[in-house]
Regions:
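Short helix-boundary/capping micro-motifs
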Residues: 10-28
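Secondary-structure junction motif
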Residues: 182-203, 270-274, 278
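A short LG(V/I)-centered, amphipathic sequence patch enriched
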Residues: 40-57
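A late-sequence structural motif
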Residues: 104, 247-281
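Central regulatory/effector-binding core of bacterial HTH transcription factors
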Residues: 89-152
């Protein structure tokens, strides 16, 4: 078992197929297949279920991936520890909530790119729950999520203050007597969806149904025509120019006041690329 074999195994798991892993690793598919089989033979176990549309980890594969993540990260940390601290470059994978990507990150990353033009930046959007898991599993270097995050392995840096509001169609002037509205939200794991559900429960409001959509603009579009209500930072409405299309309604301070934090693993040596991002916050 060597580190390259573990890197191949890790990449196949992340990409969900041997062919996609080969593309990412810039090598031929037969080499990836051979290295996975070699690793399985060496360990005497099957690591992947082979399916028509990709692969899936077996129970033994689920065990090994944790050690593979740690081994690859340990090697990366060793490289960083002896490399030139003045050189700010290389890859930087950042996760973010969709709302943060829309209103907060464009200017931030424009400034970042001006200062660190050779950093290879990649952005992955998802829910807070999904992004926390990806940071913990070494699939992201850091992520912008709704904070604070209470986890022993997570470090965090406050990035933005936000005020959460309920957003309705324009003609609704009060949310005190909403009659079984439809909730227009992201999928489960979205922290703002959780706040909306908490507010509704405490206010005695029972939703008629919950519709999960995949985009911020889609949710606001449905709200605009009266299909339902949603909850997001107030800055969404002004920054995306929805002020004249929807109504915003404040929440009690304990629910409405929140912050977005940049999270990362405490045990990872911070690269110059990540340090540079934190310094801009």
């Amino acid at each position: 078992m060597d580190i390259w074999g573990l890197k191949i195994f890790k990449t196949v798991m992340e990409e969900g197929s041997i062919s996609k892993a080969a593309v990412k690793l810039n090598c031929v598919q037969s080499n990836v297949t051979a290295r996975v089989r070699q690793l399985e033979e060496e360990l005497g176990v099957t690591l992947f279920y082979r399916k028509s549309r990709g692969v899936e980890l077996t129970a033994k594969g689920e065990i090994l991936i944790n050690y593979a993540n740690d081994a690859v990260q340990l090697l990366d940390n060793a490289f960083l520890a002896v490399s030139d601290d003045e050189l700010v470059g290389g890859p930087l994978s950042i996760g973010t909530m969709e709302s943060t990507a829309a209103i907060r990150l464009p200017e931030l990353f424009y400034s970042y790119h001006q200062k660190y033009p050779v950093v290879e930046l990649s952005i992955d959007t998802g829910t807070t729950e999904e992004l926390v898991k990806k940071v913990l599993n070494h699939r992201l270097d850091a992520a912008f999520v709704a904070g604070p995050i209470d986890h022993v392995s997570i470090g965090q840096h406050k990035a933005f203050d936000e005020q959460l509001v309920v957003i309705t169609e324009r003609k609704i002037k009060s949310i005190s007597n909403l009659d079984r509205p439809t909730f227009m939200v992201f999928r489960r794991g979205c922290s703002y969806r959780g706040v909306l559900e908490t507010w509704a429960r405490e206010s005695g409001i029972i939703p008629k149904k919950i519709m999960a959509l995949g985009t911020l603009e889609g949710i606001l579009g449905f709200v605009n025509v009266g299909m339902g209500i949603t909850l997001f930072p107030k800055s969404i409405v002004s920054n995306l120019r929805w002020e004249n299309s929807v109504s915003v309604h404040p929440l009690p301070k304990r629910l409405g006041d929140t912050s977005t934090v940049l999270i990362y693993r405490k045990d990872r040596i911070q690269t110059g690329a990540l340090k540079g991002l934190i310094e801009l916050l």
